[in-house]
Amino acid sequence: MPVFLGLPVLARFIGWLAGALIAYVAKFFTLGIARIALAISLFLGLIIGLNGLLVSYLSDLTSVLPPEIASAVSYVVPANAAPCLYAIFSLKAAVFIFDVKDRIIGYLDWNKS
């Protein structure tokens, strides 16, 4: 008879243990997914932001010059200077962004947490 009285306590303990285990696994996956989502959103934000910034800088650069200076510069600077500068700046931005991406991936190292 005393064995039957201990069954509810045993069931409660096993339920508590299973609940704690499920909560730990859910917390682990939730934090991992949140960290990955944060890293992806930061990476995409850097790419989109720097790309838009470079395009706006290069388009504003040509519209700021007075007409006399613009015609004088057109004799020296080739017609495809803006795309060339855009390619150079995009490469520098890409190197910076991928460096930041490596740092973010280093932050997301699973062995640290």
From Swiss-Prot:
Keywords: Host membrane, Membrane, Transmembrane, Transmembrane helix, Viral penetration into host cytoplasm, Viral penetration into host cytoplasm via pilus retraction, Virion, Virus entry into host cell. It comes from Escherichia phage If1. Plays essential roles both in the entry of the viral genome into the bacterial host and in budding process. The formation of the G3P-G6P complex termed adsorption complex is essential for correct termination of filamentous phage assembly. One of its GO terms (biological process) is symbiont entry into host cell. Belongs to the inovirus G6P protein family. It is found in: Virion; Host membrane. The keyword Membrane applies. Signal peptide: none annotated. Pfam families: DUF5455. Interacts with G3P; this interaction is required for proper integration of G3P and G6P into the virion. The chain crosses the membrane at residues 13-33, 36-56, 69-89. One of its GO terms (cellular component) is virion component. It is a multi-pass membrane protein. This is Head virion protein G6P. The keyword Transmembrane helix applies. Its main location: virion. The gene is VI.
